[in-house]
Structure formats: C-alpha cells, structure tokens
Design a protein with these regions (language model features):
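An alpha-helical interface "stripe"
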Residues: 1-187
Length: 187
C-alpha cells in the first residue's frame, strides 16, 4: 500500500528530502536494536561523495543495518508526495521507500509539443549542477511521461527513464511479438 502524503510541512531533512519520521519508524521496525540517527548520518555522508551515488547504493544493499527489506517488500513503508521542492526544482511526484525519496516522476501534458524534449534538457542541466549532487545521488530512478504511446517516428513522446548515475534518457518500448510456435514434426 502506498500512502499519499498531503502534509505541507513533513518532518523533512532539507538537505536530502528524506522524511525523517518515516525513515525512523521504518528503520526501527527493521532494526529494533540499532540507532536510526546513526544510519541517517552515514547515508548523508555517502550522499556527498563524488561517485554518482555508488556509495549510497552499496549502503542500501550491504549495510549491516537493514534500510530496505528487499526479501519482504511488504515490511517497507511506501509513500508518495506531489511537488515536493528540492532547491531550485520540484519533481511532479516523489516516491519514498522507508522515507527515502528514491523515485521521481515528471508528468507532461500529452501533445504539449516539446514537453519531453524540454524536460530532458532541464534534467541534464540539473544533473550537471553541483548544487543537486546529493539529490541525484539519492534518487535511484527518474521516470518521464507525456501519456502518449511509443512511436518510432517521434522519439520525443512516450515514457522514458533515467538512472541516478546518468542523465541519459532510455525509452520504454513495446517488444516485438515473437512467433514461438514450434515447427511441425519432421516426417
């Protein structure tokens, strides 16, 4: 279940957009004998590394503390918030897992002309801005959509994604339909 957050003043770490109360609640449920503040401090340190988020990602996966329960996803806390600002920009939708803003979604108006192209250009510009390093090191995936179907002839419409380590847009495309009917038996 995903909770839609409408609180305009969440207990937010403004340097990272981590939801402090949500992180602490989830962390203490997953790690009853560990201190949430220690892990938060370690994550914030790693988010400032110049490694495109690798150190933070490894901490998520390999820490002795369980930040996300990958084996039992129902043990995690899922939340989303619309238009949560970060420094000089505001993603349309932010998805949180255990208080961590790991997914950002930009939704463009269909048939808005250059909506996806303009968003791609803004994304690249933000990515290159050192002020946004922590945010890009934290967000694991970006999604962009103009709610239009994939079209080979128009490469600026459809649904796109970008991983945290690169501002390159990748497209979600429909796979070719394969005929997997076995050949008739040989006589």
């Amino acid at each position: 279940m995903i909770l839609f957050l409408t609180n305009s003043n969440p207990n937010l770490d403004t340097a990272t957009n981590i939801l402090i109360d949500s992180f602490t609640q989830a962390f203490e449920r997953l790690n009853p004998t560990k201190n949430a503040q220690d892990s938060l401090t370690e994550m914030k340190k790693r988010l400032n590394d110049n490694d495109l988020g690798k150190s933070f990602y490894e901490y998520l996966l390999k820490s002795e503390r369980q930040i996300i329960d990958f084996d039992n996803p129902n043990n995690n806390l899922y939340e989303m918030m619309a238009e949560l600002p970060y420094k000089s920009f505001r993603p349309d939708i932010t998805l949180f897992i255990n208080g961590l803003p790991l997914v950002n979604i930009e939704v463009k108006q269909p048939l808005a002309g250059q909506g996806i192209k303009e968003e791609r250009d803004r994304h690249i510009k933000r990515y290159k801005n050192p002020e946004n390093k922590v945010f890009y090191n934290l967000a694991q995936i970006w999604l962009f959509s103009d709610d239009l179907p994939y079209d080979e002839k128009n490469s600026d419409q459809g649904v796109f994604y970008s991983a945290s380590y690169s501002p390159i847009f990748q497209r979600f495309v429909e796979a070719d339909k394969l005929d997997i009917t076995p050949p008739p038996p040989k006589k």
